[in-house]
């Protein structure tokens, strides 16, 4: 099973193909990830590798967490993620994994992150509801959702009803994005299209589960 890496979204730009076609790409900075723990089926019930990225001030790390990183003889990170693996033999605590070890240009990846938070939003913005009439007897009800239920039967609002509420700041995964370029010198990945999150936010990049690179 392939593992992924942790990185930070830098922003978006574009690159040009040899034919002169403009390709929009998201730039992700992926500094070498460090293995903080290797979980085994014998000790933990399943096999997984735990990675950390970035650097966190020692004053911001609790003693139990500091001891966890010290056991692997690595600096405390400000990002952490776990990937399931088939065999623990390829990983050891303290091991450093770079972008060139996992990704190659042309393959497809899945990117997970937190979407931009939009705060409290109405149904028009949050769920793409249509607005009501601007005139013809409509008074101050242009953006209201309308009826949210039936009558005495069932006498309640069904779960999952689309209503106003908090929008964004939710985990989201965009699948099967093409990896345009891997810049191992600057620890950058150029991924075709948009990915979740604001610039500077944490993202997880994994080999795509539904699509392989061209020619494979």
Curated annotation (Swiss-Prot):
Posttranslational modification, per the record? Answer: Methylated by PrmB.
Described purpose of this protein according to its UniProt entry = One of the primary rRNA binding proteins, it binds directly near the 3'-end of the 23S rRNA, where it nucleates assembly of the 50S subunit.
Region annotation Disordered: residue ranges? 132-155
Output the Gene Ontology terms for molecular function.
Answer: rRNA binding; structural constituent of ribosome
Q: Does the keyword Ribosomal protein apply?
A: yes
By what name is this protein known? Large ribosomal subunit protein uL3
InterPro entries attached here? Ribosomal_uL3, Ribosomal_uL3_bac/org-type, Ribosomal_uL3_CS, Transl_B-barrel_sf
Q: State the organism named in the record.
A: Legionella pneumophila (strain Lens)
Q: How does it assemble?
A: Part of the 50S ribosomal subunit. Forms a cluster with proteins L14 and L19.
User: What are the N5-methylglutamine sites (modified residues) in this protein?
Assistant: 152
Q: Which GO terms describe its biological process?
A: translation
What's a GO cellular component annotated to this UniProt protein?
A: cytosolic large ribosomal subunit
Which keywords has UniProt assigned to this entry?
A: Methylation, Ribonucleoprotein, Ribosomal protein, RNA-binding, rRNA-binding
Q: Which family does it belong to?
A: Belongs to the universal ribosomal protein uL3 family.
């Amino acid at each position: 099973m392939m593992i992924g890496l942790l990185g930070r979204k830098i922003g978006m730009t574009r690159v040009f193909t040899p034919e002169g076609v403009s390709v929009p790409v998201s730039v992700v900075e992926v500094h070498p990830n460090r293995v903080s723990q290797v979980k085994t089926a014998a000790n933990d019930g399943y096999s997984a590798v735990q990675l950390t990225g970035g650097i966190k001030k020692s004053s911001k790390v609790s003693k139990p967490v500091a001891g966890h990183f010290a056991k692997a003889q690595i600096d405390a990170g400000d990002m952490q993620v776990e990937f399931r693996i088939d065999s623990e033999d390829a990983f050891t605590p303290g091991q450093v994994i770079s972008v060139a070890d996992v990704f190659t240009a042309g393959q497809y990846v899945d990117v997970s992150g937190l979407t931009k938070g939009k705060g409290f939003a109405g149904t028009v913005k949050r769920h793409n509801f249509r607005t009501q009439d601007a005139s013809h007897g409509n008074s101050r009800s242009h953006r209201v959702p309308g009826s949210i239920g039936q009558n005495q039967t069932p006498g309640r609002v069904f779960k999952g009803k689309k209503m106003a509420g908090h929008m964004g700041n939710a985990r989201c995964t965009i699948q099967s994005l093409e990896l345009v370029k891997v810049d191992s010198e600057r620890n950058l990945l150029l991924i075709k299209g948009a990915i979740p999150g604001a610039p500077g936010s944490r993202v997880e990049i994994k080999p795509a589960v539904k699509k392989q690179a061209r020619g494979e």
